[in-house]
Amino acid sequence: MTKRTFAPVPTQPNFRQLEADILQKWKDEQVFEQTQTRPAPAGEFVFYEGPPTANGKPALHHVLARSFKDLFPRFKVMQGHHVTRKGGWDTHGLPVEISVEKKLGWLGRNHGASREELEEFNRLCRTSVWETIQDWNELTERMGYWLDLGDPYITYQNSYVESVWNLLRRLHEKGLVAQDYKVVPLSPRISSTLSRAELGEVDSYRMVDDPSVYVRLPIVWDTLPERAHAALSSLSGEQRQGLSLLVWTTTPWTLPSNTLAAVNPDLDYVVADSPSGRVIVAEGAVERLSALHKDAAPLEVLARFKGRDLEWVEYEPPFPEVASQLGVVSELHERRDGKPVLHFVVMADFVSDVDGSGVAHEAPAYGAEDLEVARAYGVPLMFGVDDHGILQVTHEQGKFFKDADKGLIADMKARGLMFWAGTLKHRYPFHDRTGDPILYFAKKGWYIRTSQVAGEMLAQNEKINWVPGNIKHGRFGNWLEGNVDWAISRERYWGTPLPFWQSESGQLRVIGSVAELSELAGRDLSDLDLHRPYIDDITFTLDGEEYRRVPEVLDVWFDSGSMPYAQWGLLLNEQGEAVRGAEQFAKHYPADYICEAIDQTRGWFYSLHAISTMLYDQPAYKNVICLGHIVDEKGLKMSKSKGNVVAPLPLFDQYGADSVRWYMFMASDPGDQKRFSERLVAEAQRSYVNTLWNVYSFFVLYANLDQPDLAAAPAVAERPEMDRWLLARLEETVRDVTAALESYDARSGGRALEGFVDDLSNWYVRRSRSRFWGEGGTVDTAAYATLHEALLVVSQLTAPFTPFLADALYRNLSGEESSVHLTPWPTVRAERLDRKLTADMAAVMKVVELGRAVRGAHNLKTRQPLAGVQVRAASPEALDALKRSQTQIMEELNVKAVTFLEGDTDLVQYSLRPNLPVVGKQYGKQLPVLKKALTEADARAVATAVQAGQGFSVQADGVTFDLTPGSVLVDAKAPEGVAAAEDAGYLVAFDTALTPELVREGLARDLVRAIQEARKAAGFEVQDRIALALELDGEALEAAQAWQDFIAGEVLAEQVAYGSGEGFRAEVEGGAVTLKKL
């Protein structure tokens, strides 16, 4: 015989202690290390860890990401794969630099660092990245995220930097690296270029009120081109006086740097007479401009012509003195080769008449499109604002660019140039690290020509499985569609130095390795720190010219996007032959799976994709999960200033890391925003973790009492129907969880698991409870073996989701000193599947569920027996199943009789009314017709459609309304003395009339529940027999006397007496009871 006992478990577990014990076992047994060294028959499953920056503390959103990162590697390991879980740290970039600048008091200073300052600055950066490393390690371990932190890749290490250099040289060899002049976003306080990714995040943009001004630029008649002269020839002398171009802008601070005015050559333009003077505008803007002067007559059109007729027309700039002050020209309206140098009209297809005046103010130093136009016309740039955002000209000189608007507007008003001034609410980007408004600024920098491979990046994107799927052609696809060249240079200190050495004549040498640089420099540099300022000291001579490194460092997104290669220190020589890291790289490229927050579509996901496409013509990853952001329960972003930040570790201590992980998987689809509250974590714990634990503790308690011989259990085919049903459901669950996880659908997998555990607890154990009580000295080995197997398999299925709980269950249930995470993933045993059996049981459970809902809705206590219930099934097959399970239905619904209805019945009457919050605005004046249509509709048919979640149509007065389930409210009414409901084709209708006998039985059942609670309060074991004394009166006494045998059997009372007694006394409805253990 194979009898065994299980370690006793508490009914109320301390999950914090349980998880601590499991963590210790993992350490003692080196469980994670075993997954890295044991044979992997299914081969390598490649996972990339997106590198966090360790100089900030981990937060709740890191728990979300790490839960999803951990889930699928655990699953794949159990399927027989090897998963290398190499950790990584992103150690360069602005987050690190800004934290050090704050310590040094550098933030906002507008001059560079000396060599000594730079050396100290980078030393502090190197150490600061590890300030919170212990917090990260503690979080990683505490939540059960398995990661190799003993040998992580670190982006500041020489091997990583050198590998990144190697990639850049390869891209240069492909003709994809170039130096160019472009308008880039800057954070003024740090005067450094920002990437598109850093501005692509939702939080980078804020709704702000900015100026909206229309400014007059008087045209210069003396130099008017012939074509423009002809276009304006119909104007009288008086009408020509003060004629101006009218430009519109929301950035008055750029007006001192104005160099051009742009019009669309194909649009119609007019001279319009207005209260503020005669102006040239697009004809499509006339009505909009007329509305600006509310009390004035509409603008009068005096002449009409095409935009192309205005080319080369000169105008008076809004700030005439600036061009000469900045040294761009020596005098106003300077001409070269017969053409104006500045301040004339140019042609631009991007100008429209949809907003503004149809005449665009151009300040090419601060606008990408403006810069392209200036290049086309050979116009020099004017920098009225420097790269720290400080105005350099006008009486507003020295002010921050956004602060200068008010004074500039007042000055132009005083000089009669202001046509109209107001405000406009729109989105504007801010730097999330400094809080500064972004300054778009033309500057020379280094770029990767990603625009040349834009089509290939789109093609490679088609090969990637995105979760959620709409990201592929939505957020990520749109980002690829809008691809611009990648600005990779940063005017900063702490970062991967660009490996670009230039000669005095501009010749470029891109270095691909330390060995190459050593050879050129004529000395061994293998021990050199490759960061500034040391790398800046390295020069070499070629063909008689000295080469020095350019001062910029690399965009950190290129750093992190290089991790598939640089984590192994991959190096190729100039012939493309492997020098280092090729074997590991080939084994771990591309990734099978990556996961980060949705903002990484414009960050890490993009940099991985771009680099991989350019170098290898394939995606860097096959499957990717994009996670929505976590906000507080009000939908607000979590921040220290709002006081709504939730620290992860106290949350783990209170609810257990498993409960928090389960919440992360189940709260919403992965790409959706998650509104977090502790209440929802508590609910996740209650609904799944506690439910599973309760079944587990129930099994252990009774198995230790009965000590069943599990090996002696009958074959599955010979077990009772309830056991065969549970094992069939178990196989369905194995199938469904496996399929979901294979599809990277954690939530569906969790739902399948949660549904099974609910069935296990609230149906199988509930219906089989008496089989575990060992009445008459018999032990139901079939029941024990069935429940034991179900729990054992569930412990394996839940292992990737809730790794601590799973291991605790498995170790005790299996009797093995081995982790569940080292066991093979369950496979479906097809012979146990039984669609008919599970469908039949589902029909019974549906009726019971519907019946319980009716009881709850009508305040009919579950323990109060009712005379009968009428039941209608959704199909003939379901009806047969219900009839076979009549006894179960009676017991579950606590009724004396069941009547089965066949065919339709009018027992429940329905009426319909519009759901006004949903359809009110949509139908407006048609609401009376809609109400009539609902009154005349087949209410039962509509109710059926609504219950099924299907749309439907109703008609009245020749109007058809196509409605959704949420468009109507369905009111149900049953006859007097009947409580009923319908759903999905099922009907349950209770007879609510109560006889004295039924009332007494209900009271007896309530008394049983009260005595059971008293047993628990007294600390009795479930098997303890008791003597029971009942001090009752009235109806309670009558009920106890009538149902004495039933009460005694339920509460294990071998002696029942009336009156006072000795022992544990408890108050109950109708009196008191006293319990004494025998």
UniProtKB/Swiss-Prot annotation:
Assigned EC number: 6.1.1.5
Cellular compartment(s): Cytoplasm
* Tagged with keyword Metal-binding: yes
Q: Where is this motif: 'KMSKS' region?
A: 637-641
The protein's superkingdom reads Bacteria
Q: Name one GO cellular component term.
A: cytoplasm
Q: Please tell me which top-level EC class this enzyme sits in.
A: ligase
Q: Which cofactor does it need?
A: Zn(2+)
Matching entries from Pfam families are given as:
Anticodon_1, DUF5915, tRNA-synt_1
> Which of this chain's residues are annotated to bind ATP?
640
Would the keyword Iron be found if you checked this record's keyword annotation?
no
Q: What is known of its domains?
A: IleRS has two distinct active sites: one for aminoacylation and one for editing. The misactivated valine is translocated from the active site to the editing site, which sterically excludes the correctly activated isoleucine. The single editing site contains two valyl binding pockets, one specific for each substrate (Val-AMP or Val-tRNA(Ile)).
Q: Which family does it belong to?
A: Belongs to the class-I aminoacyl-tRNA synthetase family. IleS type 2 subfamily.
Q: What does this protein do?
A: Catalyzes the attachment of isoleucine to tRNA(Ile). As IleRS can inadvertently accommodate and process structurally similar amino acids such as valine, to avoid such errors it has two additional distinct tRNA(Ile)-dependent editing activities. One activity is designated as 'pretransfer' editing and involves the hydrolysis of activated Val-AMP. The other activity is designated 'posttransfer' editing and involves deacylation of mischarged Val-tRNA(Ile).
Under the subunit heading, UniProt states: Monomer.
Q: What is this protein called?
A: Isoleucine--tRNA ligase
Recorded source organism is Deinococcus radiodurans (strain ATCC 13939 / DSM 20539 / JCM 16871 / CCUG 27074 / LMG 4051 / NBRC 15346 / NCIMB 9279 / VKM B-1422 / R1)
